[in-house]
């Protein structure tokens, strides 16, 4: 327990130093909030959702009339030669006739076999699917950033453990050098202690790369301009939620998983496509109306000009007798409906399989944590006894190294088990649609 406290304090000291250099430490919740505001994938999918929202209108479905405004001018320049049955021919040159017109026209499809209504429902389905795709992207981002956040905690703790290993090896090297000077230890003992110290130092230096890589990855997910910027977080331990329940996870997965809900909307779209095809078996009814003004100016004749202002309207009823494709398209649409339902069932089975696998790994890792906690206590006590014997000269350097290695391995195993359990926990929460718990 004393060693564990030292590890935590060391990690806390690292976090405090970083905080002094790069500002206030951030919690996981704060990281997620920043990421949801700045991450490029999230911003892109939200813009795509806005497009779906804009498209889901009655006008886009064709439920509203179309109104057009027209205006025009035309002119004709003619030369005329008129020869009567009796008398002389009359020639007129440069006759210029002009026409001005302006009007408003309305076209409205009153009925087309329910196709317009089906199109509107389809646009609404696409709008809901856009919202689900946004949710899926956000859930993927929350899961990815949460996993990387705790990976950074893991790598930082591992760096602290390696630092502690270097301190132990340095102390052992110091003792060995002193004993070698007075003849208590051989040169072989001294060389072995130096080799072990260098090996631990090399591991410590290599671990810095993993910490840096994790920090860069978090900055990338947060869309920070400075990917190499310093990062300070509040957590110095990996806290695992051990209270998850299988029955609740299973029920919530079937009811709230975003991908499963999206597959259900795919099936609904296929059914709407079939309805749209069936609408072609019905007649259609179109309404047209117009209001316009026409002005004619004549270059010759008894009439100099004429203006016409009027309203016109009409109704057109039609029916497509044969187009050669309707029955074939209906058969294909029914097959598509069946396939979308099969795809949804396949996805549900795949999700339940993944949920079961992560659940088994989650429960197993919880037991591993408990077991490795006991091993850590035993390894720590074993190391303390070995150090006492080593200081008395009653324990060879190789056995001392073994005791040190056993302690470090125990710390590594429990850290790995905690992180693996956290990953399983994150996956279970995401599959069941509860990944938002990390935002609370």
What would you call each of these model-derived segments?
Residues 20-24, 70-108, 234-243, 275, ...:
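Small/polar, glycine/serine/threonine/aspartate-rich low-complexity segments that form flexible
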Residues 44, 49-51, 56-58, 120-122, ...:
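Heptad-repeat amphipathic alpha-helical coiled-coil interaction surface used
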Residues 26, 30, 54, 140-254, ...:
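Periplasmic alpha-helical coiled-coil/stalk elements that build and connect Gram-negative outer-membrane
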Residues 1-29, 439-440:
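Bacterial Sec-dependent N-terminal signal peptides
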Residues 180-184, 390-394, 431:
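A short glycine-centered flexible hinge/capping loop motif at secondary-structure junctions
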Residues 19-72, 78, 225-268, 348, ...:
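Bacterial Sec-pathway N-terminal export signals of envelope proteins
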Residues 43-47, 60-61, 96, 110-138, ...:
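Sec/SRP-type N-terminal targeting helices
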Residues 6-7, 20-21, 413-440:
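Acidic, low-complexity, intrinsically disordered peripheral segments
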